[in-house]
Amino acid sequence: MVSQLAVKGGEALRTRPWPAWPQPAPGVPDAVADVLGSGRWSISGPYRGTESYERRFARAFAAYNGVPHCVPAASGTASLMLALEACGIGAGDEVIVPGLSWVASGSTILGVNAVPIFCDVDPDTLCLSPEAVEAAITEHTRAIVVVHLYSALADMDALSAIAERHGLPLIEDCAQAHGATYRGVKVGALATAGTFSMQHSKVLTSGEGGAVITRDEDFARRVEHLRADGRCLSAVPPAPGAMELVETGELMGNNRCLSEFQAAILAEQLTILDEQNETRRANAAHLDGLLGELGLRPQTTSDGTTSRTYYTYAVRLPDGVLEDVPVTDVSCALTAELGFPVLPSYAPIPANRLYTPHTRRRYTLGLDHERRIDPKRFALPVCEDAARRTVTLHHAALLGDADDMGDIAAAFAKVLRHGAGLMH
């Protein structure tokens, strides 16, 4: 009966709490207290005779990802904008980006006065389609941004070959993929640069934060200037009380720096990232099997993937089932059963209510530019289909145990069984 669904007044399948997020590493309280009493709360504060947490985290995160350079930044959005500007992207340049992602994947490109060219995605991985990228390249294309979405890695073999063939920088947006590997190499280290977000929901978090990693020393130096008002860190420690930032005048920038509190948290959280990722992978593999028995299709990843990172567990509803029920209603029904948010996939960026360039006067740069950035010009059938039929769970649910995965599968089974009642 319809009443069996919790969203329709029935009894919820689960009332037990789920794992909390964030989960602070053991050393976080002491590290934050150390910053609090240090007299230096940011890299622009006076040098106190000891290495900043920002430098410590940058060195640790670079080593973790197998690259020589990491520049921390204020957010994932800031990191992507810094990488774009370090590539020389600017007014009128076209930047190819997947149409299925968080809205910032498009707005960051607008933010450097460039033109986002939204491309369709692979129907199974939900990541950028190499075929769509090849078809979208024009004489105005200046870069490709690839997003490793939810828990999948894009086809970096094909995308790297396309970028190399056309002489284009390739930027990896790894905001949802900290620690994932492709052919044994950490994501972010496979392209010109990799950008990361450390926002509250991410698997590596300091509330807000970001980073750019690269193998290119000159690129890293440009990013460093761009994020610190045109300044870079001194090559040698300054005298105590002096500023560690040097005014070189090489490249004008803005303030997109990370605070010492955030850097201290990240340095500690990095020490537990691999263990948490392994827990998520094991639970996701178990859940894949349970949901597969119900005819559901968990998101897959590209063939070159060595290890996945589960920021979000995404699953497609079975074909021919609940096709007349809005995915938002299915998500609400699952949420009611589990007491844990189950959300629809991202909307395609051009259709996202948050992506409205016309509401910002800074983007009114002439009729031609306004035409080029008009979201209505893009047709993205695979993105649209994925948004209609995909639901997602935040990675905190994957920090539980096998019983928790069983509850998730049972909730899906219940909603699939009684979901027709959602139409009334």
Swiss-Prot record:
Q: Which cofactor does it need?
A: pyridoxal 5'-phosphate
GO molecular-function term, one example from the UniProt record: transaminase activity
Q: Which reaction does it catalyse?
A: 2-deoxy-L-scyllo-inosose + L-glutamine = 2-deoxy-scyllo-inosamine + 2-oxoglutaramate; 3-amino-2,3-dideoxy-scyllo-inosose + L-glutamine = 2-deoxystreptamine + 2-oxoglutaramate
Q: What pathway is this protein a component of?
A: Metabolic intermediate biosynthesis; 2-deoxystreptamine biosynthesis; 2-deoxystreptamine from D-glucose 6-phosphate: step 2/4; Metabolic intermediate biosynthesis; 2-deoxystreptamine biosynthesis; 2-deoxystreptamine from D-glucose 6-phosphate: step 4/4; Antibiotic biosynthesis; ribostamycin biosynthesis
Where in this protein does the record say N6-(pyridoxal phosphate)lysine is found?
Answer: 202
Kindly name one Pfam family recorded for this protein.
Answer: DegT_DnrJ_EryC1
Query: Which InterPro entries does the entry mention?
Result: DegT/StrS_aminotransferase, PyrdxlP-dep_Trfase, PyrdxlP-dep_Trfase_major, PyrdxlP-dep_Trfase_small
Per UniProt, the keywords (alphabetical) are:
Aminotransferase, Antibiotic biosynthesis, Pyridoxal phosphate, Transferase
Tell me the domain of life.
Bacteria
Cross-referenced SUPFAM superfamilies, in alphabetical order?
Answer: PLP-dependent transferases (SSF53383)
What EC number(s) does this enzyme carry? 2.6.1.100, 2.6.1.101
Give the top-level enzyme category.
transferase
An example Gene Ontology biological process: polysaccharide biosynthetic process
**Into which family does the record put it?**
Belongs to the DegT/DnrJ/EryC1 family. L-glutamine:2-deoxy-scyllo-inosose/scyllo-inosose aminotransferase subfamily.
Q: Which PANTHER family match?
A: DTDP-4-AMINO-4,6-DIDEOXYGALACTOSE TRANSAMINASE (PTHR30244:SF34), TRANSAMINASE (PTHR30244)
**Record's function text:** Catalyzes the PLP-dependent transamination of 2-deoxy-scyllo-inosose (2-DOI) to form 2-deoxy-scyllo-inosamine (2-DOIA) using L-glutamine as the amino donor. Also catalyzes the transamination of 3-amino-2,3-dideoxy-scyllo-inosose (keto-2-DOIA) into 2-deoxystreptamine (2-DOS).
For this entry, the protein name equals L-glutamine:2-deoxy-scyllo-inosose aminotransferase
UniProt source species: Streptomyces ribosidificus
Q: Tell me the organism's taxonomic lineage.
A: Bacteria, Bacillati, Actinomycetota, Actinomycetes, Kitasatosporales
